[in-house]
């Protein structure tokens, strides 16, 4: 029940719908923004979070709530799912600051049957975020799809960094999958 309570609390951060493209099977879509701060420990006081919490992180983050919700939804490879957004999670963080569970976030999504389009297609971690210092070294943004959609993937890349960053459109690059 506490996970459902957190999903409700973060209803503006986890948006979902079923898209029904004409002449095609429906697509379950989840847009997510995981804040750069953990879930308030006071709300979790007295709750056993061990089945949800990352192994190498003392806190619970919205990425874990997302994972638990998806796990309970039991997406099938034959279903069309898109889960995308700013997860504020990059494996580079584990390298910079020691193990904090960022790789586990990605592994959990893979274990649920999701394919990370950008990383899968580019074969390397592709930075999507420009820090206030100007450094572009972390992939905070992710686009996951189930097998039925990944089988149709022709390409996945980021938007043009000079256009996005150069025109101050965002500090995040869009991820494009075709």
Where are these regions (language model features)?
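Active-site regions of metal-assisted phosphoester/phosphodiester hydrolases
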Residues: 1-178
């Amino acid at each position: 029940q506490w996970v459902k309570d957190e999903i409700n609390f973060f209803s503006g951060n986890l948006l979902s719908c079923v898209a029904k493209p004409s002449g095609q099977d429906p697509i379950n879509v989840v847009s997510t923004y995981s804040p750069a701060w953990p879930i308030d420990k006071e709300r979790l006081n007295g709750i056993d979070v061990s089945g949800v919490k990352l192994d190498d992180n003392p806190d619970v983050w919205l990425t874990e709530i997302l994972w638990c919700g998806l796990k309970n939804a039991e997406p099938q490879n034959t279903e069309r799912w898109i889960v995308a957004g700013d997860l504020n999670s990059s494996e580079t963080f584990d390298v910079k600051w020691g193990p904090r569970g960022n790789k586990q976030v990605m592994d959990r999504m893979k274990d649920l049957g999701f394919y990370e389009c950008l990383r899968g297609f580019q074969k390397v971690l592709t930075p999507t975020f420009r820090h206030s210092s100007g450094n572009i070294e972390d992939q905070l943004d992710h686009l996951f799809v189930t097998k039925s959609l990944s089988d149709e993937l022709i390409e996945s890349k980021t938007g043009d960094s000079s256009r996005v960053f150069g025109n101050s459109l965002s500090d995040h690059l869009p991820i494009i999958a075709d």
